[in-house]
């Protein structure tokens, strides 16, 4: 009798373990969010947003990106594929086609697209050919035909990188609706069309951006656009800037845009219901691009960025309440919150002379090479720390590619603001285990990276008149990101051990009971 009881108990435990496997994974990426943001601003957060996830889940306080450049594109691709840029090859929105010798957008078709005069709900001209590494969403879909994946972002590139080449992928179109591309589907499903017909996005865009609190409750003090009252008043603070005639641009640059994406995410969750049928497994990816937009425009030390986080926290709380209301058993959902990368601090004297002028660097370097080897177009261009040389010109002058690369690296190191310059030949010839060069090597893809990889000095950024801060450096303010995993029976805990962002995808794959993405060789996080 005791033996039968023990066997029955073991069977019940085994069944419970199987049932504990989540049927829905919600992956939330707050673009540009640094690891310390939740702790820094927790005094004004509500209990049901960021603090709920931190209180009920596993918080990894030492999660890093171990590669450079730490761009948004590289971060999203690493989160999605579970491998570093050296493998997945995505580190910028722009790459250089060696055949055409010109810059191309990685998610756009290179050949001209004949756009229809009639506006379509499904957009043309997009391609997923650059996304060669399998994503977590694609791995989930490959494990069963019944599984489903939905990815939502403000920007098309963010959505496409997270989704990969399969599944449902939506972003905010220039018309202000949620749209997709022909490479994903030929027409929008009814639940998306119904949301667009409600014109909720237009309602969110007309909302005025005002400070949520009085000035004494903010940690930051610098402000550019919004008015913050020193005392409580019946009259709410409001933004100095007028709403643009193009209301879509406002939706992409105001905190209310985060609310819009969470409202659409609720519809996505409803479209996935019921969640527990035929052992199905479903993934919902949400990328919030607006935090990065605001951080780059105003700086992470601005009241604008701080106020946006408070609004985002409220929107997140509302979404989590809705999400858990749909699931009678919370173990059936696992929620992951992380970031693609941090953002650089804003220098007090952040003028043009303190920036790295990429165009000026290209021109001066080309003049240097022309004086040394003969007049010609030696430089193709520069993007996200990668300098591309014109190989056709180098070979036509019968010069060694490695020699020209070395000359460029030596020249770059003499340029103000450059901390490190290493050639592609050096990265292919040796293995570096520590320091800046090791990070650059992990971000170097032989097929897509440039001829010389450049790292700037701390807090120095590239010249861009529309941004006061950006990511991409080798330093901790860009590499140190938040990571919280909540649900699926995970016990609340604060984990101080060091982990990396390429471990997230294989860890979630194990939690969900599916094969890890094909290119991922990172260790599963133990907890």
Regions found by a protein language model. Give the residues of each.
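Sec-dependent N-terminal signal peptides
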Residues: 5-14
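Short, structured active-site-proximal loop/turn typified by the sulfatase FGly-forming signature C/S-X-P-X-R
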Residues: 38-88, 148-152
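Non-catalytic, well-ordered alpha-helical segments in soluble enzyme domains
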Residues: 51-52, 133-142, 384-421, 497-523
């Amino acid at each position: 009798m005791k033996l039968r009881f023990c066997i029955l108990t073991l069977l019940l435990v085994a069944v419970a373990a199987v049932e504990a496997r989540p049927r829905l994974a919600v992956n939330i990426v707050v673009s540009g969010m640094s690891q310390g943001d939740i702790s820094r601003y927790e005094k004004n957060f509500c209990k049901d947003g960021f603090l709920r996830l931190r209180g009920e889940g596993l918080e990894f306080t030492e999660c890093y990106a171990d590669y450079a450049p730490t761009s948004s594109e590289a971060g999203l691709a690493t989160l999605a594929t579970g491998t570093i840029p050296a493998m997945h090859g995505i580190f910028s929105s722009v790459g250089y086609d060696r055949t055409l010798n010109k810059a191309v957008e990685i998610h756009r078709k290179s050949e001209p697209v004949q756009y229809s005069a009639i506006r379509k709900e499904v957009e043309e001209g997009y391609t997923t050919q650059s996304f060669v590494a399998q994503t977590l969403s694609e791995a989930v879909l490959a494990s069963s035909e019944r599984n489903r994946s939905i990815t939502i972002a403000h920007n098309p590139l963010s959505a496409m990188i997270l989704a990969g080449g399969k599944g449902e992928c939506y972003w905010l179109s220039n018309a202000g609706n949620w749209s997709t591309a022909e490479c994903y589907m030929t027409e929008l499903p009814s639940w998306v069309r119904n949301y667009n017909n409600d014109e909720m996005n237009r309602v969110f865009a007309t909302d005025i951006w005002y400070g949520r609190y009085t000035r004494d409750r903010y940690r930051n003090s610098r402000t550019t656009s919004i008015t913050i009252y020193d005392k409580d008043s019946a009259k709410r603070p409001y933004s100095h800037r007028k709403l643009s005639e193009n209301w879509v641009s406002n939706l992409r640059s105001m905190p209310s845009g985060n609310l819009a994406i969470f409202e659409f995410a609720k519809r996505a969750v409803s479209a996935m219901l019921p969640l527990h049928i035929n052992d199905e497994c479903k993934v919902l990816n949400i990328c919030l691009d607006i935090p990065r937009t605001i951080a780059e425009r105003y700086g992470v030390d601005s009241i604008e960025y701080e106020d946006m986080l408070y609004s985002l926290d409220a929107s997140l709380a509302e979404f989590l309440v809705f999400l858990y209301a749909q699931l009678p058993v919370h173990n059936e959902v696992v929620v992951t919150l992380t970031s693609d990368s941090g953002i650089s601090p804003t220098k007090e004297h952040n003028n043009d002379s303190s920036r790295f002028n990429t165009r000026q660097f290209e021109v001066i370097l080309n003049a240097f090479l022309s004086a040394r080897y003969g007049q010609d177009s030696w430089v193709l261009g520069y993007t996200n720390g990668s300098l591309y040389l014109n190989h056709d010109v180098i070979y036509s002058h019968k010069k060694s590619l490695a020699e020209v690369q070395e000359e460029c690296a030596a020249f770059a190191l003499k340029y103000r603001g450059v901390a490190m310059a290493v050639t592609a030949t050096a990265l292919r010839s040796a293995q570096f285990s520590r320091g800046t060069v090791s990070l650059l090597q992990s971000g170097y893809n032989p097929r897509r990276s440039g001829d010389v990889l450049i790292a700037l000095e701390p807090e120095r950024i590239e010249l861009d008149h529309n941004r006061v801060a950006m990511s991409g450096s080798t330093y901790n303010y860009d590499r140190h990101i938040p990571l919280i995993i909540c649900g699926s029976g995970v016990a609340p805990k604060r984990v101080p051990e060091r982990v990396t962002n390429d471990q997230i995808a294989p860890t979630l794959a194990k939690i969900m009971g599916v094969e890890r993405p094909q290119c991922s060789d990172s260790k599963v996080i133990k907890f």
